């Protein structure tokens, strides 16, 4: 009999109908918001907990600790509730109210750091708590079980769903788990696929992805697996996110808008390409931030 964890993965891959250039290229997007906790992070959350269980590092009833900007925390809170763990999540206090509410709804304890401390501060505090013996740190930024989830599931799904036709893979970079795992799988196939990462432009803020300082670059990231990194401005990501909703019927978050903006750039410069981008989550997590507000649309953004 299937349990909730068996509903993670095997998400749809759909072709954009009204966005993108008219040069024979195709843009396909993988709808990770269809996972039970609503994001691509469901895959990594399940992998980190299940693999730690297999190694005997954790057991139900234990306290788990993680620093998160939102989606990983929601996913971990769901898996922890399903498997009987106590979850402590640390995040900056400028993350959306919807994300906080979802974590608490699953029974997680939420510990906030200031927006000035940011994710770096959340990571430092999570490590300090683990060192004091307050729980097991899952450490998504340095845990190989994070990209392993995408090497064993997301990558193979994309390859199968495109019948091996994919020429370019585009993904926003946060923990870098998705791009690292998928690119590792694609590198092992019998054709070259160009891997493109997305990061915010200097000075831009895009929830869920980062332009990491060198000392905080996730340990799981392998630069040799990424062919190109594109800088995306916050406004471009938000406009593309809104355009996806009103032109394609895809209601997603800002980082997904950034990924599709990057995919459009790739498609425009590569006639005949088959480009796959990750839609990381759903737009309902961002309603309180105002990015879907009437003012944005009245100014012509994203339409």
Regions found by a protein language model. Name each.
Residues 1-303:
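PLP-dependent amino-acid enzyme catalytic core
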